[in-house]
Amino acid sequence: MSEEETQALVVDNGSGMVKAGVAGDDAPRCVFPSIVGRPKMPGVMVGMDQKDCYVGDEAQSKRGILTLKYPIEHGIVTNWEDMEKIWHHTFYNELRVAPEEHPVLLTEAPMNPKVNRERMTQIMFETFNVPAMYVNIQAVLSLYASGRTTGIVLDSGDGVSHTVPIYEGYAIPHAIMRLDLAGRDLTDFLMKILHDRGYSFTTTAEREIVRDIKEKLCYIALDYEEEMKKSQESSELEKTYELPDGHVITVGSERFRCPEALFQPGFLGKEAVGIGETTFQSIMKCDLDIRKDLYANIVLSGGTTMYPGIGERMTKELTSLAPSTMKIKVVAPPERKYSVWIGGSILSSLSTFQQMWITKEEYDESGPSIVHRKCF
């Protein structure tokens, strides 16, 4: 087989977006929402060639007549039937490849239940007949993408955030911390505080508008109290946003109050500590000897780490928590929105990785549990 034919496919399944493409590329070829929509009233649209299910952007655009479901909640697959639909859509409609001709690298959330890894493996080999596959933890791939093998990754996406300490390429399981606070919660919170200002956003369509406002206008304050004072005394922090219908709204302190919830989950009524302190706790659960290496390699990853100001604020928070002599370095790679996918693309193109794949033969011999022996 020629090089082109045996290229691996890399699929990063997030709670909010699926990122998929071909190993060796520097960015995913397709990025679409992890949504499956089914008609609310099947068979009402007579004469329309109505499908029984829609995936991704098409589901998003027809959301008026559909019931939308997210098969991945908080990073973990909860609905396998819909997940299969998403993978089918990824291979056949988005990438337009035959999965039976390519090895497939999938990503998983840290602390993914064992049965889930087995189920992923089973579906790949039995439903899609892939020749080989591998499952890797998302945060580990992000670290590879930054050119490191040791460090701590703060991975925050749409459904969940994790801090994952990694030493010499292996995640340290007992020190992984999970925070059920991510992009979707921040969008909801922004909807709420904009509502307090008199702008009402309620429908799923309007929610998408709020997500866009969040992505375009929000930032993280270095000092929240100072920023609040500044926003009350002058209007220099105010920005305008034009809604699809032409109305213009003004957004002020909401710009930094929304993502501040990452550092103060109390804003959302959550008991948890913020991402700065969670990172600190995660490091403290690791062996004394490697903490220095972790403090000097704090890598941000995922769409919810895209706020301007997040690197400086993380540095400030950790400096106040860590021993005073400790060198702290927070790395915020510009491509961090896709760094999980990029890490997968790098890893699956390495010649040394080729012996790591779980092959069809191995699967037929051992069954789904092979995944625990080969992917750790």
From Swiss-Prot:
Give me the Gene Ontology terms describing cellular component: cytoplasm; cytoskeleton
Task: Give one GO molecular function term.
Answer: hydrolase activity
Q: Give me the reactions it catalyses.
A: ATP + H2O = ADP + phosphate + H(+)
Coiled-coil region(s) at which residues? none
Please list every transmembrane segment annotated in the UniProt record, as residue ranges: none
The family database entries (CDD domains) matched by this protein are listed as: ASKHA_NBD_actin
Keyword Hydrolase present in the record's keywords: the answer is: yes
Q: Record's PROSITE patterns?
A: ACTINS_1, ACTINS_2, ACTINS_ACT_LIKE
Matching SUPFAM superfamilies: Actin-like ATPase domain
- What Gene3D superfamilies does the record point to? 3.30.420.40, Actin, Chain A, domain 4
Q: What is its EC number?
A: 3.6.4.-
Q: Which UniProt keywords apply?
A: ATP-binding, Cytoplasm, Cytoskeleton, Hydrolase, Nucleotide-binding
Localization, UniProt: Cytoplasm, Cytoskeleton
UniProt enzyme class: hydrolase
The signal peptide annotation in the UniProt record is none
UniProt key word Nucleotidyltransferase: no
A Pfam entry, by short name: Actin
Q: Which InterPro entries match?
A: Actin, Actin/actin-like_CS, Actin_CS, ATPase_NBD
Family indicated by similarity: Belongs to the actin family.
* Protein function: Actins are highly conserved proteins that are involved in various types of cell motility and are ubiquitously expressed in all eukaryotic cells.
Q: What is this protein called?
A: Actin
Query: What is the originating organism of this protein?
Result: Cryptosporidium parvum
Q: What lineage, starting at the top, does this entry show?
A: Eukaryota, Sar, Alveolata, Apicomplexa, Conoidasida
